[in-house]
């Protein structure tokens, strides 16, 4: 594999020599950092099993190597990446997999270790959504996830990835993560804090990642991380699990942050060792039971993961002074909800008791029941999935609801050819050779729902959202 030139500040190299255990070679570390990062994907088990995915993609000649800490994760090698980017494959467009760095799959593996089955989870720094979507798959779309992102520009990307993967149990917020300890104390069974960091572990992906690095900036970042983990710990219920992770390598932003939390709450913090998380985990194990992953150990990004349990309650923080504002939604009455459910079933959309119908003006939404306890405590950017808009003749079903709720085995499902599916993703109307019978057509490809179309004569009117329309080469190889 070709090498690339990474910029290393001298002070960084000195720090790494001190931080690296004697069992590891510093020369191996430098060599690993110079190698480009292996690409990796995670199969979205909300839509397809790993076995079915492997069978579906077998004809492509992809080399898929299992990732030890994630059953649905694979390193991927392809011969035709230049001809067809991985993100333009049919399987990616329909949400069958997520392009995710292998080491970033570790925190969620740790969160669900030992058969942990949380019902209400928070992802404190969620964009672009790799870990939120991984959490949702582990929860099988049950329970509820609060996915927070401080950067306004990244909330849109976060929602797009959640929608593409067919996820229905997520509420999005846009806050500084330091507010949650006061706003929603002891409300979560599990919390993932993948903290903002100096990014020392990503040099294989970005050779210039350390251009602005300095020991002083590490100290400033660590101070913010301590405030974030303190807030997250307050938001965690007694008995709950907190996973703290970063993509950096210095001890100040990693071990020291966790040790600070334990020193602050000595009777409430228990470190849960991760040495048995997967075969070979002990190669990265620290004496506290954390995983400090240098890039040469597993040939991946540098990463850090710690798992903690909150063993007892701690003193509450002062209540926040901000006002949440009026919640603009109201629950749909049972009788009307039954009518809506029946109409939705007619076009192949079904949901279970984990979701409840709410209304705002002419909009119909499905919210995860597990998030209702947070209403009035935080302001949501987006909650659940938008099911439909009502109009005089019935309902205008929404694309995200189709992707999350539709059954490809429904009576109105219509399977497209590869050429027809590509036209659909380009936002064009489709003229199938054999016209479907139904007026509202659930469009599928590879037995996966990809949208809802109106049949007008021999034409299927495209309803694919404009912001998702793709140009350039797609999976049939035509531009």
From Swiss-Prot:
<dbReference type="InterPro" id="IPR031341">
    <property type="entry name" value="Methyltr_RsmF_N"/>
</dbReference>
<dbReference type="Pfam" id="PF13636">
    <property type="entry name" value="Methyltranf_PUA"/>
</dbReference>
<keyword id="KW-0963">Cytoplasm</keyword>
<keyword id="KW-0808">Transferase</keyword>
<dbReference type="GO" id="GO:0005737">
    <property type="term" value="C:cytoplasm"/>
</dbReference>
<keyword id="KW-0949">S-adenosyl-L-methionine</keyword>
<feature type="binding site">
    <location>
        <position position="149"/>
    </location>
    <ligand>
        <name>S-adenosyl-L-methionine</name>
    </ligand>
</feature>
<keyword id="KW-0489">Methyltransferase</keyword>
<keyword id="KW-0694">RNA-binding</keyword>
<dbReference type="InterPro" id="IPR027391">
    <property type="entry name" value="Nol1_Nop2_Fmu_2"/>
</dbReference>
<dbReference type="GO" id="GO:0009383">
    <property type="term" value="F:rRNA (cytosine-C5-)-methyltransferase activity"/>
</dbReference>
<keyword id="KW-0698">rRNA processing</keyword>
<protein>
    <recommendedName>
        <fullName>Ribosomal RNA small subunit methyltransferase F</fullName>
        <ecNumber>2.1.1.178</ecNumber>
    </recommendedName>
</protein>
<dbReference type="InterPro" id="IPR011023">
    <property type="entry name" value="Nop2p"/>
</dbReference>
<comment type="similarity">
    <text>Belongs to the class I-like SAM-binding methyltransferase superfamily. RsmB/NOP family.</text>
</comment>
<feature type="binding site">
    <location>
        <position position="176"/>
    </location>
    <ligand>
        <name>S-adenosyl-L-methionine</name>
    </ligand>
</feature>
<comment type="function">
    <text>Specifically methylates the cytosine at position 1407 (m5C1407) of 16S rRNA.</text>
</comment>
<dbReference type="InterPro" id="IPR001678">
    <property type="entry name" value="MeTrfase_RsmB-F_NOP2_dom"/>
</dbReference>
<dbReference type="Pfam" id="PF17125">
    <property type="entry name" value="Methyltr_RsmF_N"/>
</dbReference>
<dbReference type="InterPro" id="IPR023267">
    <property type="entry name" value="RCMT"/>
</dbReference>
<feature type="binding site">
    <location>
        <begin position="125"/>
        <end position="131"/>
    </location>
    <ligand>
        <name>S-adenosyl-L-methionine</name>
    </ligand>
</feature>
<dbReference type="InterPro" id="IPR018314">
    <property type="entry name" value="RsmB/NOL1/NOP2-like_CS"/>
</dbReference>
<dbReference type="InterPro" id="IPR049560">
    <property type="entry name" value="MeTrfase_RsmB-F_NOP2_cat"/>
</dbReference>
<dbReference type="InterPro" id="IPR048457">
    <property type="entry name" value="YebU_pre-PUA_dom"/>
</dbReference>
<dbReference type="Pfam" id="PF01189">
    <property type="entry name" value="Methyltr_RsmB-F"/>
</dbReference>
<dbReference type="GO" id="GO:0070475">
    <property type="term" value="P:rRNA base methylation"/>
</dbReference>
<dbReference type="GO" id="GO:0003723">
    <property type="term" value="F:RNA binding"/>
</dbReference>
<dbReference type="Pfam" id="PF21150">
    <property type="entry name" value="YebU_pre-PUA_dom"/>
</dbReference>
<feature type="binding site">
    <location>
        <position position="194"/>
    </location>
    <ligand>
        <name>S-adenosyl-L-methionine</name>
    </ligand>
</feature>
<dbReference type="InterPro" id="IPR023545">
    <property type="entry name" value="rRNA_ssu_MeTfrase_F"/>
</dbReference>
<dbReference type="InterPro" id="IPR029063">
    <property type="entry name" value="SAM-dependent_MTases_sf"/>
</dbReference>
<feature type="active site" description="Nucleophile">
    <location>
        <position position="247"/>
    </location>
</feature>
């Amino acid at each position: 594999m070709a090498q690339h030139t990474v910029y290393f500040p001298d002070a960084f190299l000195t720090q790494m020599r001190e931080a690296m255990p004697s069992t590891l070679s510093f020369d191996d570390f430098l060599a690993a950092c110079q190698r480009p990062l292996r690409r990796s994907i995670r199969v979205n088990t909300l839509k397809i099993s790993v076995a079915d995915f492997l069978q579906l993609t077998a004809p492509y000649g992809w080399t898929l190597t299992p990732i030890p800490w994630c059953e649905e994760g694979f390193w991927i090698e392809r011969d035709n990446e230049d001809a067809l980017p991985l993100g333009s494959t049919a399987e990616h467009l329909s949400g069958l997999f997520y392009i995710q760095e292998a080491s970033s799959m570790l925190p969620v593996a740790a969160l669900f270790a030992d058969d942990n089955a949380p019902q209400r989870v928070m992802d404190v720094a969620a964009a672009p959504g790799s870990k939120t979507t991984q959490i949702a798959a582990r929860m099988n779309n049950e329970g509820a996830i609060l996915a927070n992102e401080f950067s306004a520009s990244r909330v849109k990307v976060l929602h797009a990835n959640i929608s593409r993967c067919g996820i229905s149990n997520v509420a999005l917020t846009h806050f500084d993560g330091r507010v949650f300890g006061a706003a929603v104390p002891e409300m979560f069974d599990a919390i993932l804090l993948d903290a903002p960091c100096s990014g020392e572990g990503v040099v294989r992906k970005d050779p210039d990642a350390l251009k602005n690095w300095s020991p002083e900036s590490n100290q400033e970042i660590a101070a913010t991380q301590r405030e974030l983990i303190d807030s997250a710990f307050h938001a965690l219920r007694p008995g709950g699990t907190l996973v703290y992770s970063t993509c950096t390598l210095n001890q100040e932003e990693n071990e020291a942050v966790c040790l600070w939390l334990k020193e602050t709450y000595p009777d409430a913090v228990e470190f849960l060792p991760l040495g048995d998380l997967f075969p070979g985990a002990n190669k990265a194990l620290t004496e506290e039971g954390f995983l400090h992953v240098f890039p040469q150990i597993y040939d991946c990004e540098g990463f850090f993961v710690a798992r903690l349990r909150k063993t007892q309650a701690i003193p509450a923080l002062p209540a926040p002074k901000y006002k949440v504002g009026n919640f603009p939604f109201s629950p749909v009455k049972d009788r009307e909800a039954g009518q809506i459910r029946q109409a939705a079933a007619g076009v192949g959309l079904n949901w279970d008791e984990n979701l409840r119908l709410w209304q705002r003006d002419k909009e119909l939404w499905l919210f995860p029941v597990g998030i209702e306890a947070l209403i009035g405590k935080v302001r949501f950017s987006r909650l659940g999935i938008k099911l439909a808009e009502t109009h005089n003749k019935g309902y205008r079903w929404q694309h995200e609801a189709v992707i999350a709720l539709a059954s490809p085995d429904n009576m109105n499902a219509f399977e497209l050819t590869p050429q027809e599916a590509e036209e659909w993703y380009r936002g064009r109307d489709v003229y199938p050779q054999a016209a479907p019978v139904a007026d509202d057509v659930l469009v599928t490809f590879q037995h996966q729902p990809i949208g809802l179309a109106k049949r007008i004569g021999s034409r299927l009117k495209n309803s694919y959202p404009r912001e998702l329309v793709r140009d350039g080469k797609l999976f049939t190889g035509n531009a």
